[in-house]
Design a protein with these regions (language model features):
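Charged, amphipathic alpha-helical linker segments immediately N-terminal to NTP-binding catalytic cores
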Residues: 1-27
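Hydrophobic anchor at the beta1->P-loop junction of P-loop NTPases
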Residues: 52-54
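Pre-Walker A (Motif I) flank of P-loop NTPase domains
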Residues: 47-50, 204
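Acidic, Mg2+-coordinating active-site environments of NTP-dependent enzymes
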Residues: 119-123, 147-149, 154, 169-232
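ATP-dependent carboxylate-amine ligase catalytic core
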Residues: 7, 11, 25, 31, ...
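Hydrophobic positions on the alpha1 helix immediately C-terminal to the Walker A/P-loop
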Residues: 63-66
Length: 232
């Protein structure tokens, strides 16, 4: 059994090995591939309950966790998707404060992997999804299966082209924006803020943390273009 094995069940470990083979660092921004895979999976994201979508640079993971904790305290069954993980990748997919088990994680991966293999066979997909795309798909699939009451989804990278930006949120949250992932999001604060603002949706309320004036102006302009009125 490989050094990174975390299951004594060979069938479960075989699924996990396939996931480990995907490079966590191979980020590819864009929604076309995940859209095709979601269609193949029956669009589990459409079965999700009300969604909080959280972007930003600083504090988005802790903000997501606090939102989920508050909803649980109010008596709701909550799905929480965050990244990266601290110890085990199962930590990324949480239902009611408990990370999914290794077996549940492998079950979700098997469903996503099967969908990807089928699309590749038919020529509808030219490559397997990235590690992050895969785990995002797994979270959507598992939350739909678990019938959660609320889902809290943390953006992985940026926002506008992030794999999570396929959900229809009931509330968008942008935590403080700062310089991060400059190779993908741009080297200026305004370009980074523009990408983060990409999670905002017409008619969906948004909560903005205190921002650097440059980031706040970019986000406000983005929302003004969306709603057709001044946002200050």
């Amino acid at each position: 059994m490989p050094d990174h094995a975390i299951s004594t069940d060979p069938a479960v470990q075989a699924q996990l090995d396939r996931l480990w083979a995907l490079s966590p660092g191979a980020d590819v921004l864009g929604l076309e591939r995940i859209t095709r895979l979601l269609n193949r999976l029956g669009n589990p994201q459409d079965a999700l309950p009300p969604v909080f979508h959280v972007a930003g640079t600083n504090g988005k993971g802790s903000t997501s966790a606090m939102i989920a904790a508050g909803l649980r305290e109010a008596g709701h069954r909550v799905g929480l998707f965050t990244s990266p993980h601290l110890i085990e990748p199962t930590e990324r997919i949480v239902v009611d404060g408990r990370a999914v088990s290794t077996e549940e994680f492998a079950e979700a991966f098997a469903a996503v992997h099967k969908a990807a293999e089928r699309l590749i066979e038919t020529g509808a997909l030219d490559a397997h999804p990235t590690y992050f795309e895969t785990v995002t798909l797994m979270a959507f699939w598992w939350f739909a299966k678990a019938e959660v009451d609320w889902a809290v989804i943390e953006v992985g990278l940026g926002g506008r082209l992030d794999a999570t930006n396929i959900v229809a949120p009931q509330l968008c949250v942008i935590t403080p924006v700062d310089y991060d992932h400059e190779a993908w999001l741009g080297k200026s604060l305004d370009s980074i803020a523009f990408e983060k603002a990409g999670i905002l949706k017409t008619g969906v309320p948004a909560v903005l943390a205190p921002q650097h004036p440059v980031a706040r102006e970019v986000i406000a302009r983005s929302e003004e273009r969306r709603v057709g009125k001044e946002c200050r």
